[in-house]
């Protein structure tokens, strides 16, 4: 007999009075004085569990069923019947229950049926998927990943894998993880007593990627519409609820596109993701709303129904300088916006999702297209209430002389970008793109404020367990 999932039963794909097999784990169990046990079993296919009715005439009732505790894995054969208390719900009347895995010493089981804080669960990343809250986050994450691919595929985008190991510093920052096979006790030095990277595995300095953007630009300049989707790494020594050392990004590049084109695409991508989550994960969203006491569904619907508010960087600075709020960092033109500035604009001033455009060139990456004023670049950041920046994008500098000027101004090593310069030397084309941080998006959708709760195995400063 082929086993069925609980989601199939709930969605009425399996009909009553039919003998079925299910596999799952015990959530809770209670025994009645009449010799009947009520076992709530879940299998992860949905938030809901199914109640299993186990009677004392089962051969292993005393030896096994009465000993069941939260977390035990079971295989159950039985007949589906409508609940006497609620005719819309099915119960499984067991004819056979096999215990596949016991919980050794239930009193020491870290993920018992009692409530646990999210902070506590972070110490048990390998076991926390067994909780309702992390199960809901996982299903939502899955739908978000699926919809990213589905949306872009329907728009004619081609997926291009970008390298994890790179010799490039895409963002021009020093916060990169170095990749090396050197024995720390025997690091070779050159004649200047500096590390001799020529003797390393790749013959040069290499890093874990902070972005796949530069690589997929080369494919956009021949395939027109491309994207990459994978993990990225930042060696930021920031032990906050907003930062991860390893996180997932979807990065999109489009040939012949301008800034407004990618802003519209980014908004439509987010809208479609939210629609899909509302459609596929409604029960999980309702559960999270009650658990966290926040209004998630209304928030997602508001984004879908309201257009992005466009704000020039200069206007954002004016608003922040003239407001009565005392910020930790006092702003002036030419400074980057911190999270407190972003949150003020999206949460308090506009009370909506916004996009800030045309930033000073000094605070943005070397590859962004210089505007006519020679002071700003054609860049845009989309901010969401409660989160801040969720998407960052720009027109890419397609003029070789301007690109060279910015490489020099940012004090980057010119020879490392020769291949990138080739894209401007041989049939250069206007193009634009953006990056979307998936974990921040999941944090927004689920309402979980700590980004470490929305990725299976979080990596951060001083934390690389599991």
From Swiss-Prot:
It comes from the Bacteria. SUPFAM superfamilies: Class II aaRS and biotin synthetases, Nucleic acid-binding proteins. The gene is asnS. It holds the Pfam family tRNA_anti-codon. This is Asparagine--tRNA ligase. HAMAP family: Asn_tRNA_synth (MF_00534). GO terms for molecular function: asparagine-tRNA ligase activity; ATP binding; nucleic acid binding. Disulfide bonds: none annotated. Its EC number is 6.1.1.22.
């Amino acid at each position: 007999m082929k086993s069925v999932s609980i989601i199939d039963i709930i969605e009425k794909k399996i009909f009553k009075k039919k003998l079925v097999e299910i596999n799952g784990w015990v959530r809770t169990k209670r025994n009645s004085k009449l010799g009947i046990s009520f076992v709530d079993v879940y299998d992860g296919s949905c938030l809901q569990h199914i109640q299993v009715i186990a009677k004392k005439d089962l051969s292993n009732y005393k030896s096994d069923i009465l000993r069941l505790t939260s977390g035990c894995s079971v295989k159950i054969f039985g007949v589906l019947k409508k609940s006497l208390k609620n005719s819309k719900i099915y119960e499984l009347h067991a004819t056979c229950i096999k215990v596949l895995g016991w919980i050794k010493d239930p009193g020491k089981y870290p993920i018992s049926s009692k409530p646990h804080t999210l902070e506590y669960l972070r110490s048990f990343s390998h076991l926390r998927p067994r909780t309702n809250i992390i199960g809901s986050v996982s299903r939502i994450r899955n739908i978000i990943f699926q919809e990213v691919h589905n949306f872009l595929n329907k728009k004619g985008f081609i997926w291009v894998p970008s390298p994890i190991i790179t010799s490039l510093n895409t963002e021009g920052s020093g916060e990169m993880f170095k990749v090396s096979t050197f024995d720390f006790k025997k690091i070779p030095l050159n004649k200047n007593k500096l590390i001799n990277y020529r003797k390393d595995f790749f013959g040069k300095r290499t890093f874990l990627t902070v972005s796949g953007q530069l690589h997929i630009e080369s494919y956009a300049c021949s395939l027109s519409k491309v994207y990459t989707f994978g993990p990225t790494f930042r060696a930021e020594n920031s032990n906050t609820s907003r930062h991860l050392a390893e996180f997932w990004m979807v990065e999109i590049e489009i040939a012949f596109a301008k800034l407004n084109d990618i802003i519209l695409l980014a908004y439509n991508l987010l809208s479609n993701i939210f629609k899909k989550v509302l459609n596929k994960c409604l029960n999980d969203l309702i559960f999270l709303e009650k658990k966290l006491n926040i209004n998630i569904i209304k928030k997602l619907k508001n984004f879908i129904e309201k257009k992005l508010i466009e704000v020039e960087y200069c206007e954002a600075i004016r608003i922040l300088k003239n407001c009565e709020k005392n910020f930790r960092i006092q702003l002036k033109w030419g400074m980057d916006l911190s999270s407190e500035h972003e949150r003020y604009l999206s949460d308090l001033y506009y009370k909506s999702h916004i996009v800030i455009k045309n930033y000073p060139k000094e605070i943005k990456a070397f590859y962004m297209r210089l505007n006519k004023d020679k002071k700003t670049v054609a860049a845009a950041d989309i901010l969401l209430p409660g989160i801040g920046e969720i998407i960052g994008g720009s027109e890419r500098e397609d003029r070789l002389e301007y690109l060279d000027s910015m490489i020099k101004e940012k004090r980057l090593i010119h020879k490392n970008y020769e291949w990138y310069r080739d894209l401007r030397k041989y049939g250069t084309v206007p193009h634009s793109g953006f990056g979307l941080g998936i974990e921040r998006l999941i944090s927004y959708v689920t309402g979980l404020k700590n980004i470490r709760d929305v990725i299976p195995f979080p990596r951060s400063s001083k934390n690389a367990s599991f």
